[in-house]
């Protein structure tokens, strides 16, 4: 007696339909009235911890509260869920990071007073470890946020060149750059800005090149301390 094995078609995973601009507008439409710099501060200081929590949580959708505001996120960090398709209108931790960074940038661009307020409250951990501060400009500082690569125009190409420096200086696998190299710059496709925006990209690359760029885990104060003993990082 023969056994039967039946195989059915499965939906293709198609990430090409996701539009960050549309996603951002929907995010602001849902949470915009609740956002403030305090919420953003709590999020970025706890983003790594939240990622670890999701990695251990066997739930496809999780409510995370930052600064008193509850966000429902799709959990694509739990090992069994990593390959699950994410709906275009859903929020992941990565998308939320990019959306919040974009919201901060838009708010700072519209008001010098808001820029001063943001710089006094919000800390971007990865930027700080690399020697970047608010004094280097909000587009560079916020460009270190995961997800900022979705909005290359809002961040003056800094998310792109930051990843370049991570490849060159931190030995990051260049394959991690695939996502940023597919992004649009405003209405321009990746193929267009790669040839038409070289001057701007090189300027941003050189600006980031001026940072101390310590290896992760060493703050500017720690580097200065170690230099007194001949240890240069």
UniProtKB/Swiss-Prot annotation:
Residues the entry annotates as binding RNA: 12, 15-16, 48, 51, 77, 95, 166, 178-179, 182, 184
One MF term in the entry's GO annotations: RNA binding
Primary subcellular site in the record, as a coarse category: virion
A Pfam family per the record: Bunya_nucleocap
InterPro entries associated with the record: Bunya_nucleocap, Bunya_nucleocap_C, Bunya_nucleocap_N
Keywords for this protein: Ribonucleoprotein, RNA-binding, Viral nucleoprotein, Virion
Cellular compartments per GO CC: ribonucleoprotein complex; viral nucleocapsid
Gene3D superfamilies the UniProt entry points to: 1.20.142.20, Bunyavirus nucleocapsid (N) protein, C-terminal domain (1.10.472.180)
Subcellular localization(s) per the UniProt record: Virion
Role this protein plays: Encapsidates the genome, protecting it from nucleases. The encapsidated genomic RNA is termed the nucleocapsid (NC) and serves as template for transcription and replication. The NC have a helical organization.
Assembly, per entry: Homotetramer. Binds the viral genomic RNA.
Family named by the database record: Belongs to the orthobunyavirus nucleocapsid protein family.
Domain statement: The N-terminus and C-terminus are involved in homooligomerization and play an essential role in viral RNA synthesis.
Stated name of the protein: Nucleoprotein
């Amino acid at each position: 007696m023969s056994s039967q094995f039946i195989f059915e078609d499965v939906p293709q995973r198609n990430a090409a339909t996701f539009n960050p601009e549309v996603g951002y507008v929907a995010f602001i439409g849902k949470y915009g009235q609740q956002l403030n710099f305090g919420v953003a501060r709590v999020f970025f200081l706890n983003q790594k911890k939240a990622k670890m929590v999701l990695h251990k949580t066997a739930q496809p959708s999780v409510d995370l509260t930052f600064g008193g505001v509850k966000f429902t996120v799709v959990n694509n960090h739990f090992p069994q869920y990593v390959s699950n398709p994410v709906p275009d209108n859903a929020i992941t931790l990565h998308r939320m990071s990019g959306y919040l960074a974009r919201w901060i940038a838009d708010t700072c661009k519209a008001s010098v007073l808001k820029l001063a307020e943001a710089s006094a409250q919000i800390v971007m951990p990865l930027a700080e470890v690399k020697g970047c501060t608010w004094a280097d400009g909000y587009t560079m500082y916020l460009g270190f946020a995961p997800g900022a690569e979705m909005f290359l125009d809002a961040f003056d190409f800094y998310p792109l060149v930051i990843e370049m420096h991570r490849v060159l200086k931190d030995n990051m696998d260049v394959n991690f750059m695939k996502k940023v190299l597919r992004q649009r710059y405003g209405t321009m496709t990746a193929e267009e800005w790669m040839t038409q925006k070289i001057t701007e990209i090189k300027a941003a690359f050189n600006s980031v090149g001026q940072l101390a760029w310590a290896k992760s885990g060493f703050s500017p104060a720690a580097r200065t301390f170690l230099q007194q003993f001949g240890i240069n990082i």
